[in-house]
Amino acid sequence: MELGNYTVIDTILESKVRILSSLFGGCDGDHDVRCRHDLSLAARADVYSSLVLFLRGRFRRSVRPPRQPGNNIDVYLRPLVEELLQLWHEEGVPVWDEHEQKEFNLRGLLFVTINDWPALSNISGQSNKGYNACTHCLGETDSMYLGNKNVYLGHRRFLPRQHVVRMGGGKHFRGEADNRTKPTRPTGDVMYDMVKDLKVIFGKGPGGQSVPNDSAGHVPMWKKMSIFWELPYWKILEVHSSIDVMHVTKNLCVNLLNFLGVYGKTKDTPDARQDQQRMHERDNLNPEKYQGPASYALTKEEKEIFFEVLSSIKVPSGFSSNIKGIINMTEKKFQNLKSHDCHVIMTQLLPIALRGLLPENVRVPIVKLCVFLNAISQKVIDQESLTRLQKDVVQCLVSFELVFPPSFFNIMTHLLVHLVDEIAILGPVFLHNMFPFERFMGVLKKYVHNRARPEGSISKGYGTEEVIEFCVAPP
């Protein structure tokens, strides 16, 4: 509607359409804009142009950043695979062995991939959620759906066949025996037969094609055939993607501290109690009008002792972050936990702080688990002790099944049972976890001084440091 020298806009929606449409051209600067309800859109032509420029800048800043490729990572890995194929050829590169005093052919291979849990699924092509989320058990994963999540139980089958708990002795597990055999990890040839016929078209557009769910609506075990299967030696490797102990320890620490009631919101909820009621397990924890405290939850007095012990601990410089900075003495809870903080808590501090606290059937398995994590984190591991370590961690998980509700047993808790097998194949944990890569990423981030050009800043900073090291190095 025209009113003198102004154009009156009837609705706010129309005003938004007029202004936003000018972002894509067609802006008419000869008219002034005035809203009938005296909004701030009333302006002369110069102010209107400034508003349009301001909205253009806001619109550009609101554009979503590039998303992670997810399962389409194979498209970006194509150049890497081509270089790996060049490193692995029949004749190899002749290299002189000074010790043997003879020449041999040198070839390079990709020994194992190291990723966190979501990236492991994208790289390997195996699903990391649902009923078959375990990368070792595959189709033999013991899982059930409770409380809107999958839980992974059945760790008794990893015990020796004649173990009293497995045979159903005593009152545990309702006296039922578990005669199942321990799942065996399939060989590379068997895994290749599982994925060789999968047809996947990469891309998130209309042309993309993924592996559909099964007849029951469950997530498929394999989402794609990984590009690394093109490598001729990939079938021979016993472990393709290692379990990242750093993230497993952090998730386990947070999960355990949540149930102890000293970090975040407690997971001892009525829904968790109802899961046990559905399974007919531990009737003493069934929900009532008054939800009684669980045996694994610290009381108010125990929390006082627990955090007083932690606040009094003094560690050497560089051993860990400031312990007083990660605990809140007022609320009696942990705060701002990082991966290394969880590593120090689980391997060193938690067994000390829990001495004399909690019932023995709860405290002893937790302490044994901390001892296990400390043992596998050493740089030197005796191969003869691996059998004992495997036995200890299985007994800890079985003891946890007798104490904690099913919601405690997420996939990260279940992966503990497979760590010793990977150590026997790949070596000590420090050789195949994420700590070295996270530290190096921290070094690269310090090179970024221009946030608009992070790649250029990293390249320039890394090159400058390399030149300085070359110049100051002794001849």
Q: Model regions: which residues?
A:
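Domain-level detector for long, ordered catalytic/regulatory cores in large eukaryotic signaling
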Residues: M1-V8, L13-K16, F24, R78, ...
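A short acidic (Asp/Glu
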Residues: S40-R44, I73, S121-I123, K445
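A cross-family structural signal marking well-folded subdomains
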Residues: L350-L354, N361-V362, I366, C370, ...
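Acidic, metal-ligating active-site segments
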Residues: V8-T11, I19-P66, H136-G139, F470
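Conserved, folded interaction/cargo-binding domains in eukaryotic regulatory proteins
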Residues: P365-C370, L415, V429, M434
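Active-site beta-loop-alpha junctions of metal-dependent nucleic acid enzymes
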Residues: V63-P79
